[in-house]
């Protein structure tokens, strides 16, 4: 095996793509700052107990583990940054009011999510802590849509769900809650026959519950799905509140292209309210996922309402129109103090200046040199090529 080969699911990022990703990172973090979000940078590796204390088994399976040579304890390479940021809010900052935090960093997955996914992601996201109301959910979704607009994503579509719908059904039927994992899998796959088959094998599952689950698998489409859900789902405690929360968000975003999918229950057990995903026309899967997760911070000794989102910058950049090569000024290499001073002034003004080393006049693949720094009438002057 060649020494240049990388593990499966990992890849180098070459100059043009790396430049595009870095430009996106700067643009988006600057955008989040205009909303009042503060940047934090948690470590790449933590004790596994801390990384997984507030999440389910899915994240455990995605986390690469190793032994700390200093303490002998098990460490984890983060597979998601959300729990780390939650720890910072709950334990380190320890603020009483609303806190807005954003972040960007690499995460590593033990296995790729699917055949088209990478194992190393550059995760960027934002979280609001300390407010349980609809206003925080709306602000996060507005920031998501601004994020994609800033990046240049065309025809973004917002897909809404609410974990309270599923939770209301399970709370009304304890037998159903015992099979939550299998039921959620079938619902995500919209597998109505599979739901019927599972119901036939589970003793004590109520007929109303079976009908509700089968109806739930078909409740996806436009905003009118919420009204249909009120008719078809049982009026159990918590159901009306969840549907009201969805309707409030729909009413607050009249200009957003959106859909409602009440069977998108992938975050059940983690999320505690509104959840969402955003899709773009040039990507095979959701670009952004997020939602409310009020119970997660309890693992760090402090209950705090929370809502947020994250996305993979590499995945986002890969589907965008390739950036034009950067424009640059070509300059000769030399030790003339006047040349050195001219190059320094141009760079300080924000220009890219590439000094051509002797014998390498054609080696400027990453840049388009449309100007050059030339000695004219005893002075170094920029002229158009």
From Swiss-Prot:
Top-level lineage group: Bacteria
A GO term, aspect molecular function: histidine-tRNA ligase activity
InterPro entries: aa-tRNA-synth_II/BPL/LPL, HisRS-like_core, HisRS/HisZ, HisZ
GO cellular component: cytoplasm
Keyword Transferase: no
GO biological process: histidyl-tRNA aminoacylation; L-histidine biosynthetic process
Pathway recorded for this protein: Amino-acid biosynthesis; L-histidine biosynthesis; L-histidine from 5-phospho-alpha-D-ribose 1-diphosphate: step 1/9
One Pfam entry name: tRNA-synt_His
Subcellular location: Cytoplasm
Keywords: Amino-acid biosynthesis, Cytoplasm, Histidine biosynthesis
Subunit (UniProt): Heteromultimer composed of HisG and HisZ subunits.
Family of this protein: Belongs to the class-II aminoacyl-tRNA synthetase family. HisZ subfamily.
Stated role: Required for the first step of histidine biosynthesis. May allow the feedback regulation of ATP phosphoribosyltransferase activity by histidine.
Miscellaneous comment: This function is generally fulfilled by the C-terminal part of HisG, which is missing in some bacteria such as this one.
Listed name of the protein: ATP phosphoribosyltransferase regulatory subunit
Top-level taxonomy: Bacteria, Pseudomonadati, Pseudomonadota, Betaproteobacteria, Burkholderiales
């Amino acid at each position: 095996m060649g020494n240049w080969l990388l593990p499966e699911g990992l890849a180098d990022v070459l100059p043009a793509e790396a430049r595009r990703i870095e430009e996106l990172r700067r643009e988006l973090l600057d955008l989040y700052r205009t909303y009042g979000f503060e940047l934090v940078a948690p470590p790449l590796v933590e004790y596994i107990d801390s990384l997984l204390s507030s999440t389910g088994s899915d994240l455990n399976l995605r986390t690469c583990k190793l032994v700390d040579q200093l303490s002998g304890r098990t460490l984890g390479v983060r597979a998601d940054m959300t729990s780390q940021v939650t720890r910072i809010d709950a334990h380190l900052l320890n603020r009483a009011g609303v806190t807005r935090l954003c972040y960007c960093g690499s995460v590593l997955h033990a296995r790729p999510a699917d055949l088209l996914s990478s194992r190393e992601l550059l995760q960027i996201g934002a979280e609001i802590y300390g407010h349980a109301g609809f206003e925080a959910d709306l602000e996060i979704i507005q920031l998501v849509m601004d994020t994609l607009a800033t990046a240049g994503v065309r025809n973004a579509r917002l897909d809404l769900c609410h974990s309270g719908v599923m939770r209301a059904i399970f709370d009304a039927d304890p037998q159903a809650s015992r099979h939550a994992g299998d039921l959620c899998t079938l619902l995500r796959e919209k597998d109505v026959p599979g739901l019927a088959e599972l119901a036939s094998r589970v003793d004590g599952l109520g007929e109303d519950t079976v009908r509700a689950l089968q109806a739930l698998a078909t409740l996806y489409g436009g905003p009118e799905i919420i009204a249909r859900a009120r008719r078809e789902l049982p009026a159990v405690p918590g159901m009306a509140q969840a549907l009201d929360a969805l309707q409030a968000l729909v009413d607050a975003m009249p200009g957003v292209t959106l859909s409602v999918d009440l069977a998108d229950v992938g975050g059940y057990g983690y999320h505690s309210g509104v959840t969402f995903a955003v899709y773009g026309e040039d990507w095979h899967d959701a670009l952004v996922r997020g939602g409310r997760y009020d119970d997660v911070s309890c693992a760090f000794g402090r209950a705090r309402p929370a809502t947020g989102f994250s996305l993979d910058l590499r995945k986002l950049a890969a589907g965008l129109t390739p950036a034009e090569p950067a424009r640059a000024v070509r300059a000769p290499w030399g030790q003339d103090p006047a040349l050195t001073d001219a190059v320094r002034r141009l760079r300080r003004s924000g220009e890219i200046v590439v000094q051509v080393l002797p014998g390498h006049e054609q080696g400027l693949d990453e840049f388009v040199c449309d100007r050059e720094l030339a000695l004219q009438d005893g002075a170094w002057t920029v002229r158009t090529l």
